[in-house]
């Protein structure tokens, strides 16, 4: 497929999740409606991950595409109908007998994802070592956490040009090369094992104390080495605390098998969130999630959340922006050369600020222009003028004077306060 056809096929999937309720805004949001180029809801401005959107198949396609053309193809299966790679995530179902008064019932727990190991007891141990609120039990807070992290850590628009907004053929080609590079140099999936299992494979892989590669002179020397291996102290690469031999540890092949992590410590070095499904990116002796690895390699547009592959972009408020995406967060008007105000780290044009965000003067009850000086006390504001910042009793100007605030009113003296009480 040539680049022109790829560009034509691009689309952000605006029908996906349409009308889904917002888990954060509740009834304040009319339902999810994707903005035409931002990755947020047009109604409430929250991301798709904050909405109750059923995405299991879509997320499996996304992760499947991530693993395509890598050594992790065993984790994907291609659909016969269209050849789309699908992530074969490991689902674990545990059954526990529960004693009742008359008979024994079975309590079933389904994990929406579990480490793909043959030893189910090891997988179960791994889950128990995660914080309860992050265990991906179906229908739980942990399952919602996993869903949110899949969206946040592995954005589809960081690997698939068709999920991006109006890329040029040159940008598509550059993005494809970037994705190919990180798949071959940084992408990995954690491996759950017992520390002693890796130790048994020998010092050539583990590079641990006691790993003398010289040939022993006698059988007694070999026995000493064996005893030394048994006394090996394992410590977590993240928290540096010791690990128990019988507890599962996570290894990352790209980091080398001399490093291991507690299950709860296998986190992104930037956002410190659990690496979802143990999918990691390794760079400069650090673990990253997909998002923050890409951020370390390319600028990201604060408007559309996509990586910037264009040579021309703008920087404002310590953030990067596509030239066409440095827009008002409320009305999408372009802000180049215009006055704007930052509201919750988002740029807003002056008219929208006055209309939607400006504080109201307690004196004249009009919105306070962002360029005008004001006086603020607690949650109350006034124009810093002789017409507005006045004693609520005698109308004396209080600019530069001591005053007594009382529930939105200000007084120049105790006497004036008493007259109004």
UniProtKB/Swiss-Prot annotation:
Every LIM zinc-binding domain range: 234-297, 299-359, 362-421
Protein name: Testin
Comment on protein domains: The N-terminal and the C-terminal halves of the protein can associate with each other, thereby hindering interactions with ZYX.
Family to which this protein belongs: Belongs to the prickle / espinas / testin family.
GO cellular component: cell junction; cytosol; focal adhesion; nucleus; plasma membrane; protein-containing complex
PANTHER family, per the entry: LIM DOMAIN-CONTAINING PROTEIN (PTHR24211), TESTIN (PTHR24211:SF1)
Subcellular location: Cytoplasm; Cell junction, Focal adhesion
Biased composition (Basic and acidic residues): 155-164
GO terms for biological process, alphabetical: negative regulation of cell population proliferation
Region spans: Disordered: 133-164
Outcome, altering residue 328 to A: Abolishes interaction with ACTL7A
Signal peptide: none
Annotated tissue distribution: Ubiquitous.
UniProt xrefs under PROSITE patterns: LIM_DOMAIN_1, LIM_DOMAIN_2, PET
Keywords: Cell junction, Cytoplasm, LIM domain, Metal-binding, Repeat, Zinc
Domain PET: 92-199
General function of this protein: Scaffold protein that may play a role in cell adhesion, cell spreading and in the reorganization of the actin cytoskeleton. Plays a role in the regulation of cell proliferation. May act as a tumor suppressor. Inhibits tumor cell growth.
GO terms assigned for molecular function: cadherin binding; RNA binding; zinc ion binding
Description of how the protein assembles with itself and partners: Interacts via LIM domain 1 with ZYX. Interacts (via LIM domain 3) with ENAH and VASP. Interacts with ALKBH4, talin, actin, alpha-actinin, GRIP1 and PXN. Interacts (via LIM domain 2) with ACTL7A (via N-terminus). Heterodimer with ACTL7A; the heterodimer interacts with ENAH to form a heterotrimer.
Pfam entry (one): LIM
């Amino acid at each position: 497929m040539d680049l022109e056809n790829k560009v034509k096929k691009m689309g952000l999937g605006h029908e996906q999740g349409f009308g889904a309720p917002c888990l954060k805004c509740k009834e304040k949001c009319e339902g999810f409606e994707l903005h035409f180029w931002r990755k947020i809801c047009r109604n409430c401005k929250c991301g798709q991950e904050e909405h109750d959107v059923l995405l299991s198949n879509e997320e499996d396609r996304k992760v499947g595409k991530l693993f395509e053309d890598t050594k992790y193809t065993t984790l994907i299966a291609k659909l016969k109908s269209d050849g789309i790679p699908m992530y074969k995530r490991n689902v674990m179902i545990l059954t526990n007998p529960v004693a009742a008064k008359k008979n024994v019932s079975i309590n079933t727990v389904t994990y929406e994802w579990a480490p793909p190991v043959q030893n189910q007891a090891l997988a179960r141990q791994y889950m128990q070592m995660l914080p309860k609120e992050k265990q991906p039990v179906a229908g739980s807070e942990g399952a919602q956490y996993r869903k949110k992290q899949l969206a946040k850590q592995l954005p589809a628009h960081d690997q698939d040009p068709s999920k991006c907004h109006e890329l040029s053929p040159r940008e598509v080609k550059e993005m494809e090369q970037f994705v190919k590079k990180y798949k071959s140099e940084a992408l990995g999936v954690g491996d759950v094992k017992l520390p002693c299992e890796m130790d048994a494979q020998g010092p050539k892989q583990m590079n641990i104390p006691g790993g003398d590669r010289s040939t022993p002179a006698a059988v007694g020397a070999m026995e000493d080495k064996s005893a030394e291996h048994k006394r090996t102290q394992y410590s977590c690469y993240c928290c540096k605390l010791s690990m128990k031999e019988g507890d599962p540890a996570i290894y990352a092949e790209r980091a080398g098998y001399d490093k291991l992590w507690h299950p709860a410590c296998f986190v992104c070095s930037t956002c410190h969130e659990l690496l979802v499904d143990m999918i990691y990116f390794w760079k400069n002796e650090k673990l990253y999630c997909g998002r923050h690895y890409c951020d370390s390699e390319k600028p990201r547009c604060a408007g559309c959340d996509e990586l910037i592959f264009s040579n021309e972009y703008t920087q404002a408020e310590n953030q990067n922006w596509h030239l066409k995406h440095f827009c008002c967060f409320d009305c999408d008007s372009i802000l180049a050369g215009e006055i704007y105000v930052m509201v919750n780290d988002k740029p807003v044009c002056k008219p929208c600020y006055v209309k939607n965000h400006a504080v109201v003067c307690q004196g004249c009850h009009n919105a306070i222009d962002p360029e005008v000086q004001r006086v603020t006390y607690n949650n109350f504001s006034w124009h810093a003028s002789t017409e507005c910042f006045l004693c609520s009793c005698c109308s004396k100007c209080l600019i530069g004077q001591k005053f007594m605030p009382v529930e939105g009113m200000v007084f120049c003296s105790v006497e004036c306060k008493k007259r109004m009480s």
